[in-house]
Swiss-Prot record:
Family note: Belongs to the ATPase delta chain family.
Membrane topology: Peripheral membrane protein
Protein's cellular compartments: Cell inner membrane
Pfam family, one: OSCP
GO function terms (MF aspect): proton-transporting ATP synthase activity, rotational mechanism
Gene: atpH
Function as written in the Swiss-Prot or TrEMBL entry: F(1)F(0) ATP synthase produces ATP from ADP in the presence of a proton or sodium gradient. F-type ATPases consist of two structural domains, F(1) containing the extramembraneous catalytic core and F(0) containing the membrane proton channel, linked together by a central stalk and a peripheral stalk. During catalysis, ATP synthesis in the catalytic domain of F(1) is coupled via a rotary mechanism of the central stalk subunits to proton translocation.
Subunit organization: F-type ATPases have 2 components, F(1) - the catalytic core - and F(0) - the membrane proton channel. F(1) has five subunits: alpha(3), beta(3), gamma(1), delta(1), epsilon(1). F(0) has three main subunits: a(1), b(2) and c(10-14). The alpha and beta chains form an alternating ring which encloses part of the gamma chain. F(1) is attached to F(0) by a central stalk formed by the gamma and epsilon chains, while a peripheral stalk is formed by the delta and b chains.
Signal peptide boundaries: none
Keyword Membrane on entry: yes
Species annotation: Dichelobacter nodosus (strain VCS1703A)
Name of this protein: ATP synthase subunit delta
Broad class of the protein's primary localization: membrane
Length: 184
């Protein structure tokens, strides 16, 4: 587990518990996704440690929220950002968002599967893949499909700590390892 994951965990857990208590989980998912996008921007990343930048950023971010979702920061959202800012932890917002979603999926008994594919999958292929994984895990599956041309062909699927690598690259790597082992 990375240091960022370790640092983000208590924030994600606290926010999730508060969101469940106030029945605002969906709002928090949206808020954290938007905040993650902003904080992940390269131009923003460079200035996260600057107090004056953060003051302006928070004002600008709130204006964006008013325009995009029709409402300003809630008191809880503002407190969350202020705590992260005061502790110099704004850069971990994307990891907090990831862990928040994991907590949500776990509470809903949903499995998140990340599918890496060499070529884009059409909707029919996604639904078939989702149904196959659901049969294996015996629960609902949410797919996160990402194109990764380096796989050459096929797919690599990650869920519940498991990796199923059916990519051409993975097969070539396994074949190369077998050759190396046979030489020794």
């Amino acid at each position: 587990m990375s240091q960022t994951e370790t640092i983000a965990r208590p924030y994600a857990k606290a926010v999730f518990e508060q969101a469940v208590e106030t029945e605002s989980v969906a709002n928090w998912i949206d808020f954290l996704e938007i905040a993650s996008t902003f904080v992940s921007n390269e131009a923003v990343k460079e200035h996260l440690a600057s107090a004056s930048f953060m003051e302006n950023f928070l004002v600008w971010f709130e204006q964006f929220l008013v325009e995009s979702r029709g409402e300003a920061l809630s008191e809880q959202e503002r407190n969350f950002l202020n705590v992260l800012n005061q502790q110099g932890r704004m850069a971990i917002v994307p990891e907090i968002a990831t862990q928040f979603k994991q907590l949500y999926y776990s509470a809903q008994n949903v499995c998140k599967a990340t599918v890496y594919t060499a070529l884009a999958l059409d909707e029919k292929q996604k639904k078939e893949l989702q149904a196959t994984i659901e049969r294996n895990v015996h629960r609902e599956v949410v797919l996160d499909v990402r194109e990764e041309p380096a796989l050459i062909a096929g797919v690599r699927i990650e869920y519940d700590g498991m990796v199923i690598d059916q990519s051409a690259r993975g097969r070539l790597e396994r074949f190369a390892r077998m050759l190396d082992e046979s030489r020794n």
